[in-house]
């Protein structure tokens, strides 16, 4: 097998759909006051994690991003961590 074909085959094997964490917990809407839930979607540097990492749907990702931004404005979450 050629090197490019092996690389492609390996990538196809490793791709699995992520499990949706909001669906697993039975959450339909994301609230900015739910600090523990929002911390799951923020990196150690304080950035919002991408859909590819979290496994959320596009609508849920928008809800999480809006909730995180609101929580930052209300001083429930830091804008960045050191």
UniProtKB/Swiss-Prot annotation:
Membrane-spanning intervals of the chain: none
Any Gene Ontology biological process: translation
MF terms in GO: small ribosomal subunit rRNA binding; structural constituent of ribosome
Keyword rRNA-binding: yes
Positions of the UniProt region annotated as Disordered: 1-24
Pfam families hit by this protein: Ribosomal_S18 (PF01084)
Superkingdom in the source lineage: Bacteria
Keywords carried by this UniProt record: Ribonucleoprotein, Ribosomal protein, RNA-binding, rRNA-binding
Gene3D superfamilies (UniProt xref): Ribosomal protein S18 (4.10.640.10)
GO CC term, one of those recorded: cytosolic small ribosomal subunit
Binding partners and assembly: Part of the 30S ribosomal subunit. Forms a tight heterodimer with protein bS6.
UniProt function note: Binds as a heterodimer with protein bS6 to the central domain of the 16S rRNA, where it helps stabilize the platform of the 30S subunit.
Entry similarity comment: Belongs to the bacterial ribosomal protein bS18 family.
NCBIfam families in the cross-refs: S18
The protein, known as: Small ribosomal subunit protein bS18
